[in-house]
Regions:
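Conserved Rossmann-fold cofactor-binding substructure of NAD(P)-dependent oxidoreductases
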Residues: 2-20, 29
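Short beta->alpha connector loops at strand-helix junctions that form conserved
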Residues: 3, 47-49, 83
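Adenosine-phosphate binding glycine-rich loop
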Residues: 68-114
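N-terminal Rossmann-like NAD(P) cofactor-binding module of classical short-chain dehydrogenase/reductase
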Residues: 15-24, 44-46
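Helix C-cap/helix->beta junction micro-motif
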Residues: 39-40, 75
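C-terminal catalytic/substrate-binding lobe primarily of soluble NAD(P)-dependent oxidoreductases
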Residues: 99-210
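Rossmann-fold NAD(P)-binding glycine/threonine-rich loop
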Residues: 47-77
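Short gly/pro/ser/thr-enriched loop/turn and capping motifs at secondary-structure boundaries
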Residues: 50-58, 86-88, 112-118
C-alpha cells in the first residue's frame, strides 16, 4: 500500500479498521497522522513529540497534550506520545525508579550509543531531524525552571563496567527534561533539576559541524 504522509486522507484510507496507528514518520507529519487516527477511530502512538504544532517546540509538546489529549479522550481513544527508547523507555525507567525514593532532587538521563556501523551511517534515525536536534540549544530543568543551554557543553565523564573506555557526555536537545518538568511533584517526587546528556557516534559526527 502506497501512502502519502503529506495527505491526511491518504493515511486515513490506509488505516481503516486498524486498532492502533503507530507514527514513525519525521515530526512534521504528526498532525496528519493524529488527525487520521481520530478520523478512523484508532488509538495512536508515536516515538517523540512533534515540532509541527507551534513555532517553539515546548509549545508544540503542550499542544499535543492540551489540545489533542481531550480530542482522543472524547473519542474514547488512547494517544501515547514520545514512546521510543529515548524518550519513552528511559522515561518509564525513571518513573519506575521513583517508587524507591522519598524525594528526588536531580535526574541525569545519560544516553550513550556505543554501536558504530561498518559503513558511513552517522545517525540511526532521520538525518534531517538528527541534524536539527544536534544544532539547537538543549533543554535543562534547573532549580525548577526550564532553560536553554549550548549543545556539546556541560560535559561529564563516566566509565561504567560495560564500557571499554571513559565516555564524555554533553548537552543535547531532547524531550526528557521537558516531559519531567510538566508534573515534577506528581510523578517525580518534586525533582528540581533534570538534564539529558548524550554521547556516541552521532555526537562525535555532529559536533564538528556545529
Amino acid at each position: 500500500v502506497l501512502v502519502d504522509a503529506r495527505n491526511k486522507d491518504s493515511i486515513a484510507s490506509a488505516a481503516r479498521d486498524v486498532f492502533l496507528l503507530v507514527n514513525a514518520l519525521p515530526l512534521s507529519f504528526t498532525p496528519n497522522v493524529m488527525d487520521a487516527a481520530l478520523e478512523v477511530g484508532a488509538h495512536y502512538q508515536d516515538y517523540a513529540a512533534s515540532t509541527a504544532f507551534a513555532k517553539e517546540w515546548v509549545d508544540s509538546i503542550h499542544y499535543q497534550f492540551d489540545v489533542y489529549g481531550p480530542k482522543f479522550e472524547k473519542a474514547g481513544l488512547l494517544a501515547l506520545i514520545g514512546t521510543g527508547s529515548a524518550p519513552g523507555l528511559i522515561c518509564a525507567a525513571t518513573r519506575d525508579a521513583m517508587r524507591y525514593l522519598d524525594t528526588c532532587e536531580s535526574i541525569r538521563n545519560l544516553v550513550w550509543e556505543g554501536i558504530e556501523a561498518k559503513r558511513f551511517q552517522p545517525f540511526w534515525w532521520s538525518p534531517e531531524v538528527a541534524l536539527e536536534d544536534m544544532s539547537e540549544l538543549s533543554y535543562a530543568y534547573i532549580d525548577g525552571k526550564l532553560i536553554r543551554r549550548e549543545p556539546y557543553t556541560h560535559e561529564i565523564k563516566r566509565h561504567y563496567d560495560s564500557m571499554s573506555r571513559e565516555i564524555t557526555f554533553a548537552e543535547h536537545s531532547h524531550d526528557e527534561p521537558v516531559y519531567y518538568s510538566l508534573h515534577p511533584e506528581e510523578y517525580f517526587k518534586g525533582v528540581k533539576n533534570v538534564v539529558f546528556k548524550y554521547a556516541g557516534a552521532g555526537m562525535d559526527f555532529a559536533k564538528p559541524l556545529y
